[in-house]
Amino acid sequence: MANTVSAKKMTRKIAKRTAINRSRRSRMRTFIRKVEEAIASGDAATALTALRSAEPEIMRASQKGIVHKNTASRKVSRLTARVNALQA
């Protein structure tokens, strides 16, 4: 348990930041899941629309430090490849 005033404040800050990060990570995963569900259903138009909305969310998560930049790029790249394969 935190004893000093500064340690107590840091505990509060960490809890607040954790909640924000959890929300951002969940939002990113939701957008990714929408793309994957559209791909699984075989609907190319819906998948493309979902991908266009998911890409900025994934990159925003990387800018906020939720995921690494390369991880975000890899996720976008793989989703894009799957959507393109669906259209072909």
UniProtKB/Swiss-Prot annotation:
The protein, known as:
Small ribosomal subunit protein bS20
The function of this protein is: Binds directly to 16S ribosomal RNA.
InterPro entries linked: Ribosomal_bS20, Ribosomal_bS20_sf
The scientific name of the source species is Methylobacterium sp. (strain 4-46)
Question: What keywords are annotated for this sequence in UniProt?
Answer: Ribonucleoprotein, Ribosomal protein, RNA-binding, rRNA-binding
Q: What is the lineage of its organism?
A: Bacteria, Pseudomonadati, Pseudomonadota, Alphaproteobacteria, Hyphomicrobiales
Q: Which GO terms describe its cellular component?
A: cytosol; small ribosomal subunit
Q: Which family does it belong to?
A: Belongs to the bacterial ribosomal protein bS20 family.
- Any Pfam family from its record, for instance, is Ribosomal_S20p
Q: Does the keyword Repressor apply?
A: no
Gene Ontology BP term (one): translation
Q: Which HAMAP family match?
A: Ribosomal_bS20
One Gene Ontology molecular-function label: small ribosomal subunit rRNA binding
